[in-house]
Amino acid sequence: MSGVEIILSQNIDKWATLNLNLNGYQNIVEGFSVVNLYPQENTFTANRQEILSGSIKFNGNFRFKRKFELQLTSVYLAPDIVPQGKIYSRFSIDLGVKKLIQKDKGEIFLNATDLANTMRIKRTVQGDGFHYLSTDYYETQVVRVGYTYKF
């Protein structure tokens, strides 16, 4: 596997910082053969697969009046290959807010991951005599509320 990564960061005055991470790579799964002996002897052969894939991640940090901050993150993962198949593209958006209190020694925060519930792993797998399409739903939507204090 070989690839390239580009990271861009920009401060917008004192109120915002924007970051963009671009990642591209060539993924190769070499062809292979395997002999399964159980329950009966069966030879499986997979052809060589190759794909150009990558990801994009955007992160924005925004500072507002009264020590209030907001963070927005979005992630796109391009289609990729696995032995015997393919993983389709995935996307998610996360959001977090925090408020500094107690002379900046404490903070109250709220964050939520995968707001649109789009981080599903859809894949196809195929082989000699079978083909299936699946979508895995992990528990990616999480909301956290908390308080921290710095001594």
Language model segments and positions:
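C-terminal beta-signal and adjacent terminal beta-strands/loops
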Residues: 99-151
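Outer-membrane beta-barrel proteins
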Residues: 8, 42-48, 60, 81-85, ...
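Transmembrane beta-strands of outer-membrane beta-barrel pores
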Residues: 24-28, 74-80, 112-118, 151
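Gram-negative outer-membrane beta-barrel transporters
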Residues: 1-75
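Short sequence motifs at beta-strands and strand-loop junctions characteristic
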Residues: 48-52, 87-90, 137-139
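Residues on the lipid-exposed face of transmembrane beta-strands in outer-membrane beta-barrel proteins
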Residues: 4-10, 58-62, 95-99, 110, ...
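Active-site lining segments that contact anionic ligands and/or coordinate catalytic metals
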Residues: 3, 67-69, 90-94, 105-107, ...
